[in-house]
């Protein structure tokens, strides 16, 4: 159970870190609050299978946010360096 706990804490910290650059008005604060609320909703979960499923869902969210950042950076670079013919 302590291994799952450390994985949950690690995922929480990673998602909070990713939330620093979340786009939009009050994006970082809103994203971090939503992550905090989601983790607090499941804080009393004891079933290891359910915890593993929630961890998988959290990892998926992290990958989606990372993809969003990559797309945002790509669009920014393309906009700066595109030639209008």
From Swiss-Prot:
GO terms for cellular component: mitochondrion. GO terms for molecular function: enzyme inhibitor activity. Highly expressed in the larval fat body. The keyword Nucleotide-binding does not apply. InterPro entries: Complex1_LYR_dom, Complex1_LYR_ETFRF1_LYRM5, ETFRF1. Disruption phenotype: Lethality during first instar larval development due to reduced lipid reserves and energy output, characterized by decreased ATP production and increased reactive oxygen species (ROS) levels. Metabolic defects trigger defective food-seeking behavior and lethality. Keywords: Mitochondrion. GO terms for biological process: negative regulation of oxidative phosphorylation; respiratory electron transport chain. It is found in: Mitochondrion. Was named osi after the Argentinian street language for the football term 'offside'. Acts as a regulator of the electron transfer flavoprotein by promoting the removal of flavin from the ETF holoenzyme. May act with the ETF complex to coordinate lipid homeostasis in the fat body in response to stage-specific demands. Belongs to the complex I LYR family. This is Electron transfer flavoprotein regulatory factor 1 homolog. The gene is osi.
